[in-house]
Amino acid sequence: MTKENRKRIIAVDYGTKRIGLAKTDPLQLFAQPVGTFSEEALFRAIKEISGLDGIGRILIGYPLNADGSHNRMTDIVDAFAARVHNEFPDIPLELVNEHGSSRSAGQILINSGLSRKKRHEKGRLDSASACVLLQAHLDKSH
């Protein structure tokens, strides 16, 4: 495996209140949650991951409707993606359809056996949604 391949892939689930972040393991086999952040704290977290592990790609969940059409959040995420690209111009950025990721993440949290109270803690669903996006990308790639 080349050094380039060992860089982490990260996924971002953008929300107007909280932003979920996930990253791969060093072999890019599994997604793991990093946490939930404000936008400013997210940029710091990405810089930290980049400095420690390197980042080979940034995935951003793209909020499309079931029919593939744009919605109110699409423009907001477009603006956010532009800021990410400006801040990290050397890291490839990819928008990935996030339709259904929150629902899938919610089901995973239910199946994990977490209590309802734990499942509804602020940010848990956001970071789980980022993991779902990232794991789906990894599963397609392998």
UniProtKB/Swiss-Prot annotation:
Q: Name one GO molecular function term.
A: nuclease activity
- Provide a GO biological process annotation: rRNA 5'-end processing
* Cellular compartment(s): Cytoplasm
Gene3D superfamilies associated with the record? YqgF/RNase H-like domain
GO CC terms on record? cytosol
Family, per entry: Belongs to the YqgF nuclease family.
Name the UniProt record assigns to this protein: Putative pre-16S rRNA nuclease
